[in-house]
Regions:
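Long terminal accessory regions outside catalytic cores
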Residues: 1-96, 479
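Short beta-strand segments enriched in small/hydrophobic residues
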Residues: 93-122, 127, 249-254
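Beta-alpha junction/loop-to-helix N-cap segments that form part of ligand/metal-binding clefts
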Residues: 116-118, 133-214
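Short beta-strand elements at the ligand-binding edges of bilobed clamshell
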Residues: 206, 213-237, 355-374
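An alpha-beta-alpha
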Residues: 217-288, 323
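Extracellular/periplasmic periplasmic-binding protein-like sensory domains
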Residues: 330-416, 493
Length: 507
């Protein structure tokens, strides 16, 4: 107070100028955070969803979910544009297939980034051949859309909502791929195939690598992979061969509650193998719990007491290094041991821990076999079961676009066959009339026509669909991962021992 009047204090920002800078920074930061929260778009049809902000939705290939799939996404985008331009110019109709799966796997996923890329490459090769080679007819042409289902219920729901919005505009009739055999996957597929009157999408669904037997329950779903029962029966048939006849088997199973793959694989193998050939006790572990490596060490210590000749591993490939590591230094490693697994092990050579696997194979007197879904080495071992190499032959479209990528994990072949199966049903329904329309409900009716003379000539073997949507006597390659890291097919088996051939279908 001066001369009876109050003097206003200088503002804090004026007394300390740096406070103004600090305040402006806070405002900018808050504004940026608000913008990020409000602007969830990643691209056309794709947006950030969930706490991790993963980009989920549907793209025609313009948006790349990761750099890992950038090249194949760009090729799909180019082919889709060509299909649209052909309709504009010549009136040639098209329909769309959505390839739906988790597109951004992390280190906990059973799917590797290489396997994901290969699967999409195979899907693209099938799209390209459908639009350029016409072995399954020529109309309608095929667009391929890529949908990321993410890793949570919220993200899966967002992806399905985006598909729903685009059904009419993009003429979507089928969803392919679909991921792996989990409870979450099954529920997602039910929403895909359920009638629209019940809140579903009412689209045909074709799984690429779904093997759990429980997926037979899903109406409107077919799959191109052998079921776990088929894989287990094929493994049991292989173990009846001269080299393995009489050898005793110990089963090790992942008891993770929501993994239908591991549970049904174990159940099917126990049913397929004669009781006298196996130990009564099934050794279990739970991969969803901490300390699985310690559990494997304790579990494997019992091997020298049990003295099995074969360990049948009903688990995920991501856990294989932890299973094998204790075998390298077991007391009884003078006794040879065969570890036999299911198809999920096909991705182990691309995953973390493969060097540890090779160390055990080199030093632990261990042989590693698995029943695969597809492998190029099978084509020469059982030619009658494999009517065509198709896109994967030396002059095929896969080699044209992805010559440097390997086929050993089988994912490219399975992605290709899933899309080829959808195309076969589309063209069977669409025929040659350019104005005949195909719908999702029509697709679900046509799935069961794909048998006999209409069986699909897949690169993974003949796909003759049964009424439950699973392929009949699908070829199952028995594959070895050698101590040198080389992956080779050693036999081709099937449920019942012999895979389906064209001669069988001809009567």
């Amino acid at each position: 107070m001066t001369d009876g009047s109050w003097v206003r204090a200088r503002p804090l920002w004026a007394r300390w100028p740096w406070n103004a800078v600090f305040g402006a920074s806070l405002i900018a930061l808050a504004g940026g955070l608000l913008w990020w929260m409000l602007n969830t778009s990643c691209g056309d049809g794709v947006r950030r969803v969930g706490p991790d902000g993963q980009c989920v939705g549907v793209t025609d290939g313009k948006y790349h979910y990761t750099q890992n799939v950038a090249k194949v996404s760009a090729l799909i985008r180019k082919e889709n544009r060509a299909v649209e331009q052909e309709e504009s110019k010549n009136g040639t109709p098209y329909v769309s297939i959505v390839y739906l799966m988790p597109m951004v796997p992390d280190e906990k996923d059973s799917n590797t980034v290489d396997a994901l890329r290969h699967e999409l490459q195979g899907a693209y090769a099938a799209q390209y051949d459908a639009n350029h080679h016409f072995s399954n007819g020529d109309v309608p042409r095929i667009k391929l859309l890529l949908a990321n289902s993410g890793s949570s219920a919220e993200q899966r729901s967002a992806a399905l909502d985006e598909i729903r919005k685009r059904i009419e505009a993009d003429r979507i009739v089928a969803v392919a791929g679909l991921g792996t055999s989990t409870n979450a996957t099954k529920e997602m597929i039910r929403k895909v195939t359920r009638p629209r009157s019940e809140g579903g999408l009412e689209l045909g669904a074709v799984g690429a690598v779904l093997t759990a037997d429980t997926f037979d329950e899903v109406e409107g779903l077919v799959r191109v992979a052998p079921t776990n029962s088929d894989e287990a029966a094929a493994a049991a048939a292989f173990l009846q061969s001269k080299e393995y006849a009489g050898k005793r088997v110990l089963v090790v199973q992942d008891s993770k509650p929501d993994d239908q793959y591991t549970r049904t694989l174990s159940q099917a193998f126990l049913k397929a193998l004669p009781e006298k050939r196996r130990f009564a006790r099934v050794e279990q572990y739970d991969s969803s719990q901490a300390g699985s490596a310690t559990n494997f060490k304790a579990l494997m210590a019992n091997l020298c007491t049990y003295k099995p000749d074969v360990v049948y591993f009903a688990g995920r490939g991501v856990d294989l290094p932890k299973l094998l590591a204790p075998l390298r230094t077991r007391i009884c490693n003078d006794r040879p041991l065969t570890v036999f697994a299911g198809d999920d092990v096909s991705q182990s050579p691309q995953a973390a821990g493969f060097d540890e696997i090779l160390e055990t194979l080199r030093d632990g007197n261990v042989e590693l076999l698995y029943t695969g879904l597809a492998h190029p080495g099978a084509w020469k071992l059982a030619e009658g079961a494999y009517p065509t190499e198709g896109a994967f032959g030396e002059k095929g479209s896969y080699r044209k676009f992805f010559r440097n990528d390997q086929l050993d994990d089988g994912q490219a072949i399975m992605g290709h066959d899933a899309v080829t199966t959808a195309v076969s049903a589309i063209r069977l329904e669409g025929g040659t009339a350019a104005d005949q329309k195909v719908s999702g409900s029509m697709m679900m009716q046509r799935w069961k026509s794909l048998h006999g003379v209409h069986a699909v000539a897949g690169a993974s073997g003949l796909i003759s669909l049964q009424n439950n949507g699973s392929p009949e006597r699908k070829a199952v390659p028995v594959i070895e991962i050698g101590s040198d890291g080389i992956v080779r097919t050693v036999a081709v088996s099937a449920n019942g021992g012999d895979p389906l051939t064209r001669k069988d279908l001809a009567g």
